[in-house]
Amino acid sequence: MANKMNLAFSALSENESFARVTVSAFIAQLDPTMEELTEIKTIVSEAVTNAIIHGYENDPNGQVYITAELKDRELELIIRDEGVGISDLDEARQPLYTSKPELERSGMGFTIMENFCQELKVISEPMIGTTVYVKKQLTTTKAMCR
């Protein structure tokens, strides 16, 4: 049986931790390992930070949307903004690329997300926004003994 949640919040940097914790609480029902939980929190953090800093350019009037769906032991995440979009996705997905070097960002967000999931798809259109699709399979071994 699938279980689904939807979340929308203002594009404020202080809401990044809120998004991370909310998704973590949602997947807790599957009793993920600490490693899986850390990876999921990192994926959410990277995608939400990208939406706030790059998509909305720190405009708090923007909204970030997250949908999380659990099917068996698979997590599907959709993190979406309606910001400025990404003009060159191939370039943006290159390790160490950043569109804001003045912020001393490492440009590793997409690379990190790719390494922590089974599937990462990014769709973006200039002046329409960006949607990040993530699929992550959780191990069959649960974190705690029952």
Swiss-Prot record:
GO terms for biological process: asexual sporulation; negative regulation of sporulation resulting in formation of a cellular spore; sporulation resulting in formation of a cellular spore. It catalyses: L-seryl-[protein] + ATP = O-phospho-L-seryl-[protein] + ADP + H(+); L-threonyl-[protein] + ATP = O-phospho-L-threonyl-[protein] + ADP + H(+). It is an enzyme of class 2 (transferase). Keywords: ATP-binding, Kinase, Nucleotide-binding, Serine/threonine-protein kinase, Sporulation, Transferase. InterPro entries: Anti-sigma-factor_SerPK, Anti-sigma_F, HATPase_C_sf. Gene3D superfamilies: Histidine kinase-like ATPase, C-terminal domain. Pfam families: HATPase_c_2. HAMAP family: Anti_sigma_F (MF_00637). PANTHER family: ANTI-SIGMA-F FACTOR RSBW (PTHR35526:SF3), ANTI-SIGMA-F FACTOR RSBW-RELATED (PTHR35526). This is Anti-sigma F factor. It comes from Shouchella clausii (strain KSM-K16). The lineage of its organism: Bacteria, Bacillati, Bacillota, Bacilli, Bacillales. The gene is spoIIAB.
